[in-house]
C-alpha cells in the first residue's frame, strides 16, 4: 500500500512523540526503504541511547512506547549505544534521516 509524504511525516512525528520521554535516548534515525519507497513494508528505526540495560530489554521497552505507530506500519527497532563500534548496519544508518536529537 502506498504511503504519501504527509503520512510518512505523520508517522515520524508519532514515533518521536512516543519515544522522546525516555531520558536515555539522544537520537532517533529512520533508515532503509521507508525513506525511498512509496510503499515500504516497514520502518527501520535506530535509537541512539546511553542506557546500560541489555539490548533485548531496550528493544522491548521501545516497542511498547511505539505501539501506536506499529499498528499502522511494522517497525524494526535497533537500540544502539552511543559511540557504537563500526559494523555493516551503521553504514545504512549513517545514510538515514535524523528525526530527533537531544
Region roles according to the model:
Residues 1-29, 35-40, 50-102:
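Catalytic core of pol beta-like nucleotidyltransferases
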Amino acid at each position: 500500500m502506498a504511503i504519501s509524504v504527509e503520512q510518512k511525516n505523520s508517522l515520524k512525528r508519532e514515533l518521536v512523540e512516543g519515544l522522546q520521554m525516555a531520558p536515555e535516548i539522544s537520537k532517533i534515525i529512520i533508515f532503509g526503504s521507508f525513506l525511498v519507497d512509496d510503499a515500504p513494508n516497514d520502518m527501520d528505526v535506530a535509537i541512539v541511547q546511553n542506557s546500560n540495560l541489555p539490548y533485548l530489554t531496550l528493544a522491548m521497552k521501545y516497542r511498547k512506547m511505539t505501539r501506536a505507530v506499529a499498528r499502522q506500519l511494522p517497525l524494526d527497532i535497533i537500540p544502539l549505544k552511543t559511540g557504537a563500534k563500526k559494523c555493516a548496519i551503521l553504514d545504512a544508518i549513517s545514510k538515514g534521516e535524523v528525526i530527533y536529537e537531544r
